[in-house]
Amino acid sequence: MSRWLLTYLLLLSSFMSMAQGIVIHGTVRFKEDDEPAAGVNVMLFGQDRKSMLGFGQTDGNGRFRLEYSGTADSLVLRCTGMDIKMQERRIPASDQRLDIIVTTSPLVIREAKVKADPMSAKGDTVVYYVGQFRDETDRAIGDVLKKMPGITVEESGRIAYNGKPINRFYIEGMDMMGKSYGVATNNVRAEDIASVEVYERHQPVKALEDIERTDQAALNLRLKDDAKGVWNAMAQLGAGYKPAMWNAEGLGMRFSKAFQTLLTYKGNNEGEDVASKEVLPFEQTDDLAEMLGIRTLSEPSIDRTKYLFNNLHAASVNAMFKLRKNLDIVAKATYLKDRQTADGVTSTKYFFKDGPPVEVNENLSSVHSTNRADLEFKIRNNSSKHYLNESVEFNGVWNEGLGTSGGVSQLHHSDKIVLKNNFTDLVRLGSTVFSVLSDSEYARLPERLNVSSFLFSDSVAEAVQRVKSERFKMTNELRFSVNKGNWQFRITGNANLSIENLDSELSVCDTDSGLQEAQSLSFDKKHYTDIPTDSLKNDLTLQRIDVVLSPAIEYNLGDPMKATLSFPVDYRLSKISGTSNNRFLLTPKLTVSGDATNNLRYNISVSYNDIEGEINGLYSGYILTDYRMLARKSGVLPRTSSLAVSGRLEYKNPVSGLVASAALRWSRSWRDMIFSSVIDGSRLQESALAMDNHSDNLQASINAAKRFQSLSTTINASLIWSLNESSIIRQSSLMSVRRANVQGRITTLTKLSSFLNMEYSGSLSNTSSGLSKCEPLSSIFYLRQYLLTNITFRKPWIIRAEIEHYLNNLISGKDRNTLFAGLSLSYKKNRFEYSLAARNLLNPKIFNHIQTSDLIEYSSIRTLRPASVMLKILFNLG
């Protein structure tokens, strides 16, 4: 019996071994530029080269995977494609990873006229052909990107694909711009671009391409042949009235295989916000934030060119040198000098659980000056076996603000310096990955706020609040991962150090003596008690040591499914001004993603986070954050825990030009601290109290975009619904606040004829807020509509007419609806382009804006720029 059982087990083992088969996977890349080769056919043949034993196709990252369960000892692997030379390789019949290099061999079709599709797809790469979207009115590539389904471009130049921001912006496969690519979006000439490639689930580290994929896309600009390796430059001058206005721009660029550069200068006082579009990074890093400031008008929901009074100079230098195939150097420098003024009236209405609301009215006038300098130097090696990155950054921001509110004057000054260094070294040996990371950062931010007519004491004529923040951070990381078939096992260890200092002092000056240390301040006894001197100072040091162990396991079936479970455990030792404590912080996460079909993709995620507060949430002494607000925290580091569950579906069909997505997210946060505020006339005191509380968030969104090529029309639409519930304390009463919001947007861009194209965009928002389980205290409906018409006649002449409409239901009278109109005429001949623009033709003097948050209603009446005329002359140097 045992002999039969042994024979059966041997046969079963042999059968299972044969059924399991072997796995052959790897990447295919182009020899010319080492870029991934998408859409390449990868086939397995027997030794006779006739019988096909396996077939696959590379995805957008050039990855492929084949399975073979036969008995042959060796096989023939063949790579074919319409734009590559066929390549064959004899390989052993065993589990292996292959890196295949192919050369291009374009297919030429003679005397054939084919109407090109506007977009196509190969694996994870979606290609948009610029010529199918561009018209005579498009100057920068950002103008064309707005017409491509699935791609959205913000006014700042930030790009999102299918509702998610991109993680890289390439020009001919080279990453020169980094996180500040808005300058390229708004300046690279549309006429120089042949196609735009979107790499879905893009992994920027080549050594991890077939191991770890992301859920973000990257965008790559492919140049026309005549735009490669040549200098393109332009200069523009402009003058206008009313008031006296000027504009000056200079631009130079060159893109080749070994060298890329983009040089810009822009200056104006016409209200063009170059700073947010081309200077400031989209992803603000964890720098020190200002704690003080002057009270200014809130930003209204209209285009900044309509109300921004500025005087700006901005210059940038961006250069990238490719030393060899995978080694490059990036150098960047940016300088900004900006002065902005604003005037208007604001009203803040505070609602309470019981009793009538309190309304605070202010006449605000402000002047804000900024000088900013950013420098970055980076050397990077990015190959399929080795990733090395060494970067050094310097950021300096010098701000000064002068403001008045009635009889109160405010002067704020801050100087921020940030130095950063990043070193990353990652090595791949087969399916095993080793990496070392070391980040260090030093930041310093001294601030001073001078306030006259001090509101918190009748005996004080002037107050001076000083705050100095300083921080040093170091992050060190070791990582090891190994792949076994469909499984990846990864472990990461961190040893982090953080040292933060916060010093503050409030000094006062009365009418009889000079500046001195503040004595106790007296308040309305109904809500306040006297504040002693020692509560007006802070001298804090926060030291942290983190030892983090992050194990992760991943099961990867390729496109159909990938599941990743990570469980970071952070042991944190904190020392606060001599007092030590320790705790564990947990951040587990489970993600399951993949392709349900060739066109439909899914992503499901569950995560839990433990977060500990920073030093700016620790101080217990009062700080005068602006002229009418005193704030303090509990003196204990706040802790927040959160649980989030999300799901997302993405659909794309390049043949029909349809791209869509839908997402749903729920989260709950638990906090051990709550903010309490007391309002006494125009004075506001805010403090943090130790109290357990929680908040809930629920959000659903839908995005869809469709290209109708026969109509030369692109339609983008989105809808977002959100619900939030949280707790606050006001006038010593605990209140549960509920806020619901619905936002919708639709944009249509169409070319009606060879001489007429139009753009329409409409957005609406409905926000209601109030106490939970009660009728909403307020509901705001907001509508914006914009219509643009471009008429081209006799080729060089273009007429541009635009009209814009705003509606806010909480505003009464004639200001409930606001209309703006503009008209411009441009003429182009040879290298010159002349434009004459008339702005704000209907000449509304003010704009009324209302918004709500946490049972507070903010309304402002802001002075607008007057009707004006601007003449510009642009000269193309190459």
Where are these regions (language model features)?
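Face-selective signature of the C-terminal outer-membrane beta-barrel domain
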Residues: 324-338, 368-403, 409-577, 588, ...
